[in-house]
């Protein structure tokens, strides 16, 4: 399921991500994100955090994850990395991971009309 999801990502016109090459790292991102979110929930359960700048603690957790992978990369490097790197490009470490995390849907009230929405039966749920 995850291989197909990433194989369908067009990173540049005519160039798709390689879900087979990146499978191990994509699964690691998925698992790590789930474990990190559980740790976040555990760390804040006795001292809940408030809304800051209009964002809930849960939203800020996912925004921090997305910010970690933000960056600019030239098309030439996208081509090289897509063909040789077992890690997905930063953009897809975010936009490829979050749609498989139910807590992200809950935090941002994601619905079927939102661009990154993935139907529950098509989401990867390893943990």
Model-assigned labels for residue ranges:
Residues 1-127:
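Zinc-dependent metallohydrolase catalytic domains
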């Amino acid at each position: 399921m995850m291989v197909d999801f990433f194989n369908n990502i067009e990173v540049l016109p005519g160039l798709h991500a390689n879900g087979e090459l990146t499978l191990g790292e994509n699964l690691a991102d998925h698992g790590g994100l789930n474990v990190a979110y559980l740790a976040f929930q555990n760390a804040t359960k006795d001292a809940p955090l408030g809304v800051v700048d209009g964002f809930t603690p849960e939203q800020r957790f996912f925004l921090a994850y997305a910010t970690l992978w933000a960056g600019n990369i030239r098309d030439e490097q996208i081509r090289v990395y897509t063909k040789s790197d077992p890690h997905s490009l930063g953009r897809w470490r975010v936009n490829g991971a979050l749609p498989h995390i139910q807590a992200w849907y809950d935090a941002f009230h994601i619905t079927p009309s939102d661009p990154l929405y993935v139907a529950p039966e098509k989401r990867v749920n390893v943990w």
